[in-house]
């Protein structure tokens, strides 16, 4: 009898404690799997501790599709990997406009004009997102040792880079590792090259017209920019394995070969993603480094993700404003392996990771004069930016100098037929 009473009392106390101690989730955030997820979740824990709001982060391989197919989900805040997805969800009335969550004054003080424009719907004229993170594309990576061996040249423009390449290139001394093969997505790296050339040679106005599909690829600025890719990849003895290798070998090989003493290449043209594929036994600044795509301008092409709101209440509004605040991520950025670069231009917390810090410096300069531009291929209609443009550039590189220069008008006209 005593044992039975003890068990009943024990169960009552346990259940009561569990009931009163349990706090339901107040705000659910959903988004992609990300590097440094553990550090992001620690930042969410800091918000929990300061506000008393319980937060949960859920990962999805395709958050945009999930939200479309689950229109009545419990998700309160979503991180969308590209601005096109943001406007798509906004026009479907799945996410809310920013004017319900953040003041116009705050948005203007935190974000460049361009970052606000590309999350604004052309249909409703409403902005549906606030950028969270940014990553640069416009980088030239190099082997520190090999770079010293060729005299540590400095370049003020792409033309200077081409001239040096032409003068230096000789048999068995290929200067560039430029593999771009990426399965069904082969061509996306070449679109990054094209974007760098257009932005830095023709400026933000032409770049914006092209990304908005207001000018055709057959028009001179774009056609000439494609041929400027050819001036690099078709230079004799300039590219490891020649132009034929470029579209046939996986892009991850670039960074292994770049730091291989038995491979001659000094440079590789890529973005932030290169850091994911550098050999683990090699160190930044000691073994490899980068410089911005050469230009007298601060212009940078990059990518990033966007914070959006689905369900409005005071808890969600408070958490959202904490996420975009200039103080967010202070602990995250203090870690030596942090890859977090805030899109908020006022967030200038110390970044311990030297690569991330150097990348952030370039991004801040470009944001300050509104010359940061989002990856154009991701702003275009998907049948163009994620298909026809990839195919066109892959074919252009593969067919070689004579045919490419002869058939460039046919290639661009075929591309324009998708507009």
Predicted regions located by residue number:
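Hinge/lid segment of periplasmic solute-binding proteins
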Residues: 82-138
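Short, solvent-exposed loop/beta-turn-alpha elements that line the ligand-binding surface or hinge
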Residues: 99-110, 184, 200-224, 278-281, ...
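Conserved N-terminal structural module of periplasmic/extracytoplasmic solute-binding proteins
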Residues: 1-87, 403-406, 413-419
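Conserved C-terminal helix/tail region of periplasmic/extracytoplasmic solute-binding proteins
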Residues: 353-419
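Glycine-centered hinge/linker elements that transmit conformational signals in sensory
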Residues: 208-247
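Short helix-initiation/N-cap motifs at beta->coil->alpha
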Residues: 58-67, 242-256
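Extracytoplasmic/periplasmic solute-binding protein
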Residues: 128-132, 162-214
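Extracytoplasmic/periplasmic substrate-recognition and gating elements
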Residues: 126, 278-343
């Amino acid at each position: 009898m005593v044992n039975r009473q003890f068990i009943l009392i024990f169960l009552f106390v346990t259940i009561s404690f569990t009931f009163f101690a349990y706090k339901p989730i107040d705000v659910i955030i959903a988004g992609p799997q990300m590097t440094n997820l553990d550090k992001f979740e620690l930042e969410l824990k800091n918000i929990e501790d300061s506000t008393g709001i319980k937060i949960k982060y859920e990962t999805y391989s395709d958050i945009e599709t999930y939200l479309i197919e689950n229109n009545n989900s419990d998700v309160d805040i979503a991180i969308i990997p590209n601005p096109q997805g943001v406007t798509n969800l906004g026009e479907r009335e799945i996410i809310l406009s920013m004017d319900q969550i953040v003041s116009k004054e705050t948005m203007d003080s935190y974000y460049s004009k361009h970052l606000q424009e590309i999350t604004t719907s052309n249909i409703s004229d409403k902005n549906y997102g606030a950028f969270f993170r940014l990553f640069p594309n416009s980088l030239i990576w190099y082997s520190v040792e090999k770079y010293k061996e060729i005299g540590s040249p400095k370049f003020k423009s792409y033309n200077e880079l081409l001239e040096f390449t032409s003068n230096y290139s000789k048999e068995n001394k290929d200067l560039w590792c430029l593999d771009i093969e990426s399965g069904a997505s082969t061509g996306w790296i070449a679109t990054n090259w094209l974007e760098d050339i257009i932005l830095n040679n023709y400026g933000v106005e032409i770049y914006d017209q092209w990304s908005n599909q207001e000018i055709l690829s057959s028009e001179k600025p774009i056609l000439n920019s494609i041929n400027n890719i050819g001036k690099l990849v078709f230079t004799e003895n300039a590219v490891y394995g020649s132009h034929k290798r470029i579209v046939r070998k996986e892009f991850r090989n670039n960074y292994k070969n770049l730091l291989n003493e038995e491979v001659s290449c000094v440079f590789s043209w890529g973005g932030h993603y290169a850091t994911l594929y550098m050999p683990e036994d090699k160190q930044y600044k000691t073994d490899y480094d980068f410089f911005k795509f050469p230009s007298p301008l601060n212009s940078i092409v990059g990518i990033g993700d966007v914070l959006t709101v689905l369900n409005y209440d005071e808890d969600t509004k408070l958490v959202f404003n904490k996420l975009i605040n200039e103080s967010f991520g202070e602990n995250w950025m203090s870690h030596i392996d942090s890859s977090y670069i805030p899109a908020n231009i006022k967030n200038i917390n110390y970044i311990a990771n030297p690569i991330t810090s150097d990348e952030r410096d370039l991004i801040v300069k470009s944001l300050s004069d509104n010359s940061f531009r989002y990856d154009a291929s991701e702003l275009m209609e998907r049948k163009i930016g994620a298909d026809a443009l990839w195919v066109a550039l892959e074919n252009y590189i593969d067919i070689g100098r004579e045919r490419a220069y002869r058939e460039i008008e046919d290639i661009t006209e075929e591309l324009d037929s998708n507009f």
